[in-house]
A protein has these predicted regions:
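Extracellular/lumenal mature domains of secreted and surface-exposed proteins
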Residues: 1-98
Length: 98
């Protein structure tokens, strides 16, 4: 008989963006809402803004220089090395757009 192995659950990567429809040059704020069902905790976060910019931390901010469609990716890792990612598309409008 083989010994039982404990299967750990993957962390859940989640985040929100404010404002959801920014203008070029406007600062957006991101808020990590990730969790670890196993309770080990999130050790680090890496953000990729889709325009070459990156950040770490739970609540970074970012400015897109140009209007366009971008995908923001958050990757999180738990203290025991499990990874998860979440993606959100953001449509950055021209500075004068309503």
């Amino acid at each position: 008989m083989l010994p039982a192995t404990s299967q750990k659950e993957q962390p859940i990567a989640e985040f929100t963006i404010r404002p959801r429809a920014p203008r070029a040059g406007q600062t957006i704020e991101l808020f990590d809402a990730s969790s670890d069902p196993d309770g080990v905790g999130v050790a680090w976060r890496v953000w990729d803004f889709g325009d070459g910019g990156t950040a770490t931390g739970a609540s970074p901010s970012h400015r897109y220089a140009q209007a366009g469609a971008y995908v923001i990716t958050l990757t999180v890792a738990t203290f025991d090395g499990r990874l998860a990612s979440a993606k959100h598309a953001v449509a950055v409008r021209e500075p004068g757009a309503r």
